[in-house]
Design a protein with these regions (language model features):
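Histone-fold recognition with a strong bias for associated Lys/Arg-rich disordered tails
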Residues: 1-151
Length: 151
């Protein structure tokens, strides 16, 4: 499956998360979209399953932004145009597609991106969540609970 096919299965909200992730990368003057920007996009989107899960776990946009700034800081120049995903963020997207398949969903939603982020587990986003006292297993369990799915 090439990337065009993969993104065709993304819900409107999941596509919005990717656009918001790019905006967040630009806000921080980063010339890449990393897992931290995906997390910011998921929180900022505000209406999808992932946003609901993160809200249920007490994750707030202002706290995530502060943690990202503390951990990696800001870039030194304004970034314009399209920004690419880091290898780790690409892996999260691949895992999101896989999570959708495992759950037998015909679409890729915000919940799958969040599950991919948790499953990847080693990026800055995972570190940000853990620094906020949110364990990755909690995120997975809460996501499945909100979806009404058992493992």
């Amino acid at each position: 499956m090439d990337s065009r096919d993969r993104f065709n299965k993304f819900t409107e909200r999941a596509r919005k998360v990717l656009a918001l992730a790019q905006e967040e990368a630009q806000r921080f003057q980063h010339n890449y979209i990393g897992t931290e920007h995906l997390l910011l996009g998921l929180v900022r989107e505000g209406e999808g399953v992932a946003a609901k899960v993160l809200t249920n776990l007490g994750v707030q946009l202002s706290d995530v932004r502060r943690a990202v700034e503390f951990i990696i800081g800001r870039g030194d120049r304004i970034v314009e145009g399209e920004i690419g995903l880091t290898p780790r963020a690409k892996k999260v997207i691949e895992l999101a597609v896989d999570e959708a398949k495992l759950l037998k969903h015909q679409y890729i939603g915000t919940e799958h991106i969040l599950l991919g982020l948790v499953r990847e587990g080693g990026g800055i986003a995972a570190g940000v969540l853990e620094s906020m006292g949110v364990k990755l297993e909690q995120v997975r369990a809460e996501t499945l609970k909100v979806l009404g799915t058992k493992e």
